Design a protein with these regions (language model features):
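Long, charge-dense
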Residues: 1-2, 137-171
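Conserved mixed alpha/beta catalytic, RNA-binding, or beta-rich assembly cores of soluble enzyme
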Residues: 1-11, 23, 27-132
């Protein structure tokens, strides 16, 4: 869905711009609502249909272009697509002391997000406990993401649907 390398990326973007300027039937799928999407709704041209709800309910056969505002990966099949990825995900990370290999753990975290259809670009911040501040995995994640640190007291106040017995032991 996104090529991040030079000529191919610009060729894809030029194709998307060309399709939009030609006013081909376009689906605008909004999975996040904010000031930016409100503006898109207010200024939507006639060749664009706005969709909400479940992406699987959008009949892609009606469109030659899809624009998505979403933190999720969606398969647009052969329909050209432009993804706007808002930073809306808050990811909590806990790990063993000096966990490694660092690269493998970071790849596992990102892979788990992708396998759950979340785009890593949608991460607003990663949260962890203060004691993990100097862990190599956290330092590596800090290169790409904002990290928020919390005290054990602060974390006790947060309701978690599936609490970890290991984490609760340290709280």
């Amino acid at each position: 869905w996104a090529d991040i390398h030079g000529e191919k990326e610009f060729g894809m973007m030029n194709n998307i711009i060309s399709l939009f300027v030609k006013k081909v039937p376009t689906a605008l799928f909004l999975e996040v609502r904010d000031q930016g999407t409100e503006y898109l709704e207010k200024t939507c041209p006639p060749h664009v249909d706005i969709h909400y709800g479940l992406f699987r309910d959008v009949d892609l056969s009606r469109y030659q272009l899809v624009i998505l505002v979403t933190p999720f990966l969606h398969n647009t099949h052969d329909t050209p697509a432009l993804f706007y990825v808002p930073k809306v995900l808050h990811v909590g990370v806990g790990l063993a002391h000096q966990a490694g290999p660092v690269h493998d753990i970071v790849e596992n975290i990102l892979g788990t997000m992708i396998n759950s259809t979340f785009m890593p670009r949608a991460v607003k911040y990663i949260a962890t406990i203060n004691e993990k501040r100097n862990e190599p995995v956290i330092k590596e994640l800090e290169r790409a993401y904002q990290i928020r640190y919390y005290s054990a007291e602060e974390l006790k106040e947060i309701s978690v649907p599936n609490p970890s017995p290991v984490v609760e032991k340290h709280m």
